From Swiss-Prot:
Coiled coil (UniProt feature): none
Top enzyme category: hydrolase
Gene source species: Clostridium novyi (strain NT)
SMART domains from the UniProt entry: AAA
Transmembrane residue ranges: 10-30, 113-133
Record note on cofactor: Binds 1 zinc ion per subunit.
Name used for this protein in its record: ATP-dependent zinc metalloprotease FtsH
Protein function: Acts as a processive, ATP-dependent zinc metallopeptidase for both cytoplasmic and membrane proteins. Plays a role in the quality control of integral membrane proteins.
Keyword Glycosyltransferase appears in the UniProt entry: no
Quaternary state and interactors: Homohexamer.
Topological domains annotated Extracellular: 31-112
Length: 676
């Protein structure tokens, strides 16, 4: 670092010195030009001379230039070029006034070459500036960031020795690792594949939601393969200059050929691989030119032996079909959200360098985080570690992990916010309404936690978690989901006798579920098993702006009626449940007003009519028994959870943790009030 700082200082000092030299010569030029100011014509000079207005003259070395001064009040300086044939006669012979001071400039004793020094220095300075500009334009010796290197690839080359990520650092994706391990094995031992006549895939596309570990898998491939690894982002290809993207693609593959066998990884390839179209302006698109060059390099007339292209995207629907065909991206690997077992394995990876207390159960934690991807779980463990440090604890406990889950989902608590008692009451009944309706809806998930403490933009929340990972949502479950979401609004109507803006998000989610049931899932008895509306964008304008409508206005009217019927049915069912269990609604709301937060076990005890004191005594007895059986805790627990091999993980679809918000701070409503 010291050497870099010294170089920076020397570079800045050189720049300042050069600037001072330039300013010096600029000042000399200005002074020289000022000396030549006041130039007059020969006729004017002759007129002044005859009229006795000249006080002194000085004849320069060249014998033609005459400088002088007028005898006016301003002592005006002048300079004139007089023909040599008239110089002696006009000034010396016809001198009208003997008092005029005539002076000859003496010949210079300085060698002529000295007068050339300023010009030589100025030329050297200009040459120096040109050299510095060329060095900067060529990237200063590296980085390919210079003006003259626009066409050079910006891919970063990672050598095998610099790769520290391996497949041991990737968990919860056994099938995905298996697909990529085959690529690694081919790079290490290509002979057995070639003898069998097999062709290794030229390209592998990693597809999946954000945070599932696509880039991490690519890094692991680089670490395991032991070959050069070029990594670049899709956005690095396209610049403001025409032809730069295609040039960079060519340069990237030229570099890869020199380092073959190797791997090229393009992250976020949708930035350059978006489906081609006419575009809004109808003109030529620089991105399309880049894509065309990429298509040619992947499978054209050229031969790219030993080069494997790995790309990642979370938008496979917008990629060009020519890019996805066999021979280019032969294999697409779906990197989805892990199931409960996969989440447990991911958690084991992320707790290697963390100190956990004995009460931490990663299996329980994995079950309580459905829908969490690898990035979410890493963030969860980091939040728990920060909470433990904030509380001055030596280890991370289950309490910190539970709080971290809620923080990741709903945001941090805002206990300091002053809330009016009437608002607390509305929030308590709103959340209690959600919980009671979910409790008595057979297809709803169990309630995990209820709180009226503000978090994020919400004034309270009701969290319910699924008992297991599911791949599908039945019609009955979707209907009960709508009933649970409307429980808060119905509770307000029954208890308060008025409704508020707190259920705005609930209503939005209910409307979305009902509309998807009718238009996408074919769950409408009246309209039948038909999908309404196109699920893809218009190809002509680049697949993102316009959607086609393939149904009539009459059908649109029926769709709206069916959506309204589903929502009304859910509202009536929620109203019936709360009316039948009004005593339980009051009981849960009362405890919420006292404690502000109720766990799932406490909620079940309240609904079943059991006193909370018995539940607390039971929990204290369990904690005491644990404390008696706990052995001495070692500070360093690194390596306890290292073994994550040999686990078979089933790939399931993503399940999201549902939280029903209550009383989100409706800033839009406040702005409307101000406008009124």
């Amino acid at each position: 670092m010291g050497g870099i700082n010294v170089k920076k200082r020397l570079s800045s000092a050189t720049i300042w010195i050069v600037l001072l030299i330039v300013l010096f010569f600029a000042a000399i030029t200005v002074l020289e030009s000022s000396k030549t100011s006041g130039a007059i014509s020969y006729n004017e000079f002759k007129k002044y001379w005859i009229e006795n207005k000249v006080s002194r003259v000085e004849i320069k070395q060249d014998g033609r230039t005459v400088a002088g001064e007028l005898n006016d009040k301003a002592k005006t300086q002048f300079q004139v070029v007089v023909p040599q044939s008239l110089l002696v006669q006009d000034i010396l012979v016809n001198n009208p006034k003997s008092s005029v001071n005539v002076k000859f400039e003496p010949a210079s004793s300085m060698p002529m070459w000295i007068s050339w020094i300023p010009t030589i220095i100025l030329i050297l300075v200009m040459v120096g500036f040109w050299v510095m500009f060329m060095q900067q334009s060529q990237g200063g010796g590296g980085g390919n960031r210079g003006v003259m290197n626009f066409g050079k690839s910006r891919a970063k080359l990672a050598t095998p020795d610099s790769q520290k990520v391996t497949f041991k650092d990737v968990a919860g994706a056994d099938e995905e690792k298996g697909e990529l391990e085959e690529i690694v094995d081919f790079l290490k031992e290509p002979k057995k594949y070639l003898d069998m006549g097999a062709r290794i895939p030229k390209g592998i596309l990693l597809v999946g939601p954000p945070g599932t570990g696509k880039t991490l898998l690519a890094k692991a491939v680089a670490g395991e393969a032991g070959v050069p690894f070029f990594s670049i982002s899709g956005s690095d290809f396209v610049e403001m200059f025409v032809g730069v993207g295609a040039s960079r693609v060519r340069d990237l593959f030229e570099q890869a050929k020199k380092n073959s066998p190797c791997i090229i990884f393009i992250d976020e390839i949708d930035a350059v691989g978006r489906q081609r179209g006419a575009g809004l302006g109808g003109g030529h698109d620089e991105r399309e030119q880049t894509l065309n060059q990429l298509l040619v390099e992947m499978d054209g007339f050229g031969v790219n032996e030993g080069i494997i292209l790995v790309a990642a995207t979370n938008r496979p629907d917008i990629l060009d079909k020519a890019l996805l065909r066999p021979g280019r991206f032969d294999r697409q690997i779906l990197v989805g959200a892990p199931d409960a077992k996969g989440r447990e394995e991911v958690l084991k990876v992320h707790v290697r360098n963390k100190r956990l207390s004995d009460d931490v159960d990663l299996k329980v934690l994995a079950k309580r985080t459905p829908g969490f991807v690898g990035a979410d779980l890493e963030n969860l463990m980091n939040e728990a570690a920060l909470l433990a440090v904030r509380a001055n604890k030596k280890q991370i406990g289950m309490e910190e992990l539970e709080e971290a889950i809620t923080r990741v989902i709903a945001g941090p608590e805002k206990k300091s916010r002053v809330i009016h008692e009437e608002d607390r009451k509305i929030t308590a009944y709103h959340e209690a309404g959600h919980a009671i309706v979910m409790k008595f809806s057979p297809h709803s998930d169990p309630v995990h936690e209820i709180s009226i403490i503000p978090r994020g933009m919400a004034g309270g929340y009701t969290m319910h978690l699924p008992e297991r990972d599911t791949s599908y949502m039945s019609k009955s479950k979707l209907k009960d989901e709508m009933v649970g979401l409307l429980g808060g609004r119905v509770a307000e109507q029954i208890i308060i006798g008025d409704i508020s803006t707190g259920a705005s998000n609930d209503i939005q989610r209910v409307s979305n579920i009902a509309r998807k049931m009718v238009m996408e899932y074919g769950m409408s008895e009246k309209l039948g098993t038909i999908t309404f509306g196109s699920d893809h964008d218009e190809v002509f304008i680049g697949r993102e702006i316009g959607k086609s409508k393939n149904y009539s206005e009459e059908v649109a009217f029926e769709i709206d009626n069916e959506v309204k019927a589903l929502v009304d049915e859910a509202y009536k069912k929620a109203e019936k449940i709360l009316t039948e269990h009004i005593d339980k609604l009051h009981a849960v709301a009362k405890v919420l007003l006292d404690k502000e937060k109720v766990t799932g076990e406490e909620f079940n005890a309240i609904v079943e009519g059991r006193p909370l004191e018995e539940l607390n005594k039971k929990e204290n007895a369990i904690d005491l028994e644990k404390h008696d059986n706990v052995e001495e805790v070692h500070d360093d627990v690194e390596g306890v959870h290292d073994d994550v091999e040999g686990v078979n993980i089933k790939d399931t679809s993503e399940d999201n943790i549902e939280t029903t918000d209550a009383f989100a701070n409706n800033t839009d409503l406040e702005e409307d009030k101000k406008e009124i």
